[in-house]
């Protein structure tokens, strides 16, 4: 598959680039570009998978965030209050001096479950968000 390649520039913090380079080496990529292309493909697949949330869904949002980020805790709380009818439970864990982990279990229309995760994802100071969903009607 011969596709024209486009050159882009990316600015990253040193520690993130170091971790990425370590993964590149361990996975045997021939270059950073190969690793970045693979990471972008995975990101696109994850995004497309997240958009397949039709109907009733049970979800878990996993967040890691900097609790010292000004206004972040209040913004996260406001989002949770906005969707209080969907949120069944949440667990808060202090990971270290700067970082907290939050698990939020919710149930509702898939598009709204995704909306909650996306609102949290957009907040400054949120370092990681992962949404996992299942259908409550899944036959085993």
Curated annotation (Swiss-Prot):
One of its GO terms (biological process) is response to nickel cation. Keywords: DNA-binding, Metal-binding, Nickel, Transcription, Transcription regulation. Binds 1 nickel ion per subunit. One of its GO terms (molecular function) is nickel cation binding. Disulfide bonds: none annotated. Its cofactor is Ni(2+). Ni(2+) binds at residues 81, 92, 94, 100. Transcriptional regulator. Belongs to the transcriptional regulatory CopG/NikR family. This is Putative nickel-responsive regulator.
């Amino acid at each position: 598959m011969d596709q024209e390649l486009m050159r882009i520039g990316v600015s990253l913090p040193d520690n993130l680039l170091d971790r990425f380079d370590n993964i590149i080496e361990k996975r045997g990529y021939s270059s950073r570009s190969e690793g970045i292309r693979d990471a972008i493909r995975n990101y696109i697949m994850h995004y497309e998978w997240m958009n397949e949330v039709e109907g009733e869904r049970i979800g878990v949002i996993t967040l890691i965030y900097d609790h010292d980020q000004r206004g972040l805790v209040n913004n996260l709380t406001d989002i949770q209050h906005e969707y209080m009818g969907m949120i069944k439970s949440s667990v808060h864990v202090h990971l270290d001096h700067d970082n907290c982990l939050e698990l939020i279990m919710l149930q509702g229309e898939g598009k709204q479950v995704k909306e909650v995760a996306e609102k949290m994802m957009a907040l400054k100071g949120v370092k990681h968000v992962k949404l996992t969903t299942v259908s409550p009607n899944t036959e085993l």
